[in-house]
Structure formats: C-alpha cells, structure tokens
Amino acid sequence: MRKIKIITDSTAGLTLEEAAKWNIDVLYLTVEIDGKVYNPKTDITPEEFMVRMAETKELPKSSQPAIGSFVEAYEKYTAEGYEILSIHLTEKLSGTVNAARQAADMVEGNITVVDCDYTARGQAFQVLKAAEMAQSGDYSVEEIHAKINDIRDKTKLYIVVVTLDNLIKGGRVGRMQGFLGSLLNIKLIAKLTDGQLEEETKVRSNKKVLQYCLNLIKDEPKKIQHLDVVHANGLNLADDFIAESKEITGLTEIPLFFADPVISTHAGTGAFAFMYYTD
C-alpha cells in the first residue's frame, strides 16, 4: 500500500474536521495587524479578525509560511516513508508555493509541489480529492496529480467585493476612484483566471450582484458537481445566493464557510465568493 501525504496551506479554508478526517497537514499563513502577528490556527478566529481589520487604518499584511516550516514537515514525512504531494494557492497571489518548492529542493525524497491556480475552496476541491485518493492507497502521486489537474481545469471561482475600502488601502484602487465607487454603491465582481484575479463586471446594487451571479450559474453549460460559498461577513448575499443556486443546480447541499483572514484582507468586509467544478 502506497504511503502518500497531502500537505496544503491555510488559504484552502479546510475545516479542522476535514483535515483530521483525511489526514491532511495544513501550514498556516500569518496576518499582521498594527505590528502584531497572528497565526489563524491559534491566535485569532476569522470572525475576530474581521473586527480587528475594521478597527485599523492600515491594511493587514499576510505572510507565507517560512521555508523552515515546509522543510520540517517534508523531513518528518519522508523519514516516515511517505511520498508527499504539497498543494498550494496560486503563486499570483502569494509566494507560498515558491517557498514550498525551495524547501522540496532541500529535502531528499519524493516531493511533488503543486500550484493549484486557485485559493479558498477552489483550492480545497483539489486538496480533498487528493487526500481521498491518497487515503485509499490505490493511486500513485502521478495519478492523483493528473486527477487534481482535471478538477483545476473544470473549476471556476468568482468573488464579489461590496466595499472598495481594502482595495483603496492596498493601493489597488485610487482614493478618488474608491470614493466615487462608494458614492455610487458600486460592487465589483471578479473572476480568478489562470491564478490571476480579473474584473468580471461592476454593478450598482446587491440585487444586481445576486442576479448576475445566479445568471453565471444558470448559464454554465456543464453539470455542476460541487459548489461552495465563502463569505467575509457577507451572509445576506451568500444566503440568498445559496437558496437560489440550490433551485438552479439541483444540489441539495451547498456548504458555506467563513473566509480565511488572508482572503478577507484582500476582499474586505461584506465580500462573498463562490466556486464550483463541473463534469
């Protein structure tokens, strides 16, 4: 029976139950608020982070896991006879996967590092399938890698930014443009494409946000296998979207998750995202 260990990072948004059930190791990105560094695993909950973020004038900073954390994990599991499949968020948003690659070069053993091209539950889709296949003992690393690449190619991820405050703080939107956007109640809908966030459209009310997002689901030509929703204090939109999407897709379950602090930093208060993969 093959011994394959799946490792990922915290931006995948796995629950503690999922990580335990599938024996997945999670390395945590940290966040810094007003000079103090927090580890989301031990120091701050996603809900607490939203409160702290609202209170600070500066945009919180996120930091990838140290290379030493990857080296430690890789050495531990290779010494126990495991092959390793290490799956991480797109390098367009973080240097995490590059840190993993550098660590893999420093450790002897069969270590495969994957840039999944996504983050949040779009990343989790690949991680959970990889862990399920690894736990069965019936598949090689190459077979698992091929399967998660297939899921990646069939995944779509959209994010709705309802306030431009964090984009202004982060310098992604000019202050005047941000002021006008807030004045006009503009909501930004973006799509993650090839690991890069790109503007999909702008709308001017929550009603139009919901309508646009539901139309994306309605117009999907292939059958949606799995649909997850993530929010950063954006429950109103997320709940309405889930209720309507169940009717459209026939899915009986559409899980809802609170966003990881790193995701919330970029998306801001009130944001929600949905991601799915198809046949």
Curated annotation (Swiss-Prot):
Keyword Lipid biosynthesis among UniProt keywords: no
Family annotation (InterPro entries): DegV (IPR003797), DegV_C (IPR043168), DegV_domain_contain (IPR050270)
Coiled-coil region: none
Chain residues that bind hexadecanoate: S62, S94
Signal peptide extent: none
Keywords for this protein: Lipid-binding
Domain DegV as annotated: residue spans: 4-278
Alphabetized GO MF terms: lipid binding
SUPFAM superfamilies, per the entry: DAK1/DegV-like
Keyword presence, Acetylation: no
UniProt xrefs under NCBIfam families: DegV
Cited function: May bind long-chain fatty acids, such as palmitate, and may play a role in lipid transport or fatty acid metabolism.
Protein name: DegV domain-containing protein lmo1863
Biological source species: Listeria monocytogenes serovar 1/2a (strain ATCC BAA-679 / EGD-e)
